[in-house]
Amino acid sequence: MAARMCCQLDPARDVLCLRPVGAESRGRPLPGPLGALPPSSASAVPADHGSHLSLRGLPVCSFSSAGPCALRFTSARRMETTVNAPWSLPTVLHKRTIGLSGRSMTWIEEYIKDCVFKDWEELGEEIRLKVFVLGGCRHKLVCSPAPCNFFTSA
C-alpha cells in the first residue's frame, strides 16, 4: 500500500508541499482544494524514521515531523507518453523554474489530482512513482549539470 500524502500549494514559492498523513486517516488526502491541509497532518509521521512507509526514492526530509521539503511528483507512466497530457510536465515545470511562461498552476494541480493520485493511491503503483524536487531541498539534487534531469528513480 502506498504512503498517503497531503498536498499544500505555497503560492509564495510557487511549489506544492507534501506532508505524510497518519495511517489512521481514511479516504483521499485531497478532500478540498490543494491549499487546504487538515490540521492533524502536520506532524502525523514521527521524526525518528519512516520505515513504515512503502515509498522509495524520497529524501530524508520526507519523514520529518515538519513534513518534506517542497516536492513535485508525477507517475512514471504518465511521464513516458505524450498521449495522456497536452504538455510534458517536466518541460512545463522547467520553464517555470527558469522564468519562462508555462501552463498555470491550476493545470498542474489538475494533472496531479487526475493522474498521480489515481495511479498512486487507487492502483497502488508506488513502484512506478518518481519524485520531482523543485528548489530549496538540500537533501536531493534538483538537476545534473547538462542536460538538466529533474527526476530521480523511485
Curated annotation (Swiss-Prot):
Q: What is known about its subunit structure?
A: May form homodimer. May interact with host CEBPA, CFLAR, CREB1, DDB1, E4F1, HBXIP, HSPD1/HSP60, NFKBIA, POLR2E and SMAD4. Interacts with host SMC5-SMC6 complex and induces its degradation. Interacts with host TRPC4AP; leading to prevent ubiquitination of TRPC4AP. Interacts with host PLSCR1; this interaction promotes ubiquitination and degradation of HBx and impairs HBx-mediated cell proliferation.
The role this protein plays is: Multifunctional protein that plays a role in silencing host antiviral defenses and promoting viral transcription. Does not seem to be essential for HBV infection. May be directly involved in development of cirrhosis and liver cancer (hepatocellular carcinoma). Most of cytosolic activities involve modulation of cytosolic calcium. The effect on apoptosis is controversial depending on the cell types in which the studies have been conducted. May induce apoptosis by localizing in mitochondria and causing loss of mitochondrial membrane potential.
Transmembrane annotation, as ranges:
none
Record localization: Host cytoplasm; Host nucleus; Host mitochondrion
Q: Which gene encodes it?
A: X
Q: Which family does it belong to?
A: Belongs to the orthohepadnavirus protein X family.
Q: Looking at the record, which segments are called Mitochondrial targeting sequence?
A: 68-117
Instruction: Tell me which UniProt keywords the record has, alphabetically.
Output: Activation of host NF-kappa-B by virus, Activator, Apoptosis, Host cytoplasm, Host G2/M cell cycle arrest by virus, Host mitochondrion, Host nucleus, Host-virus interaction, Modulation of host cell cycle by virus, Transcription, Transcription regulation
Name of this protein: Protein X
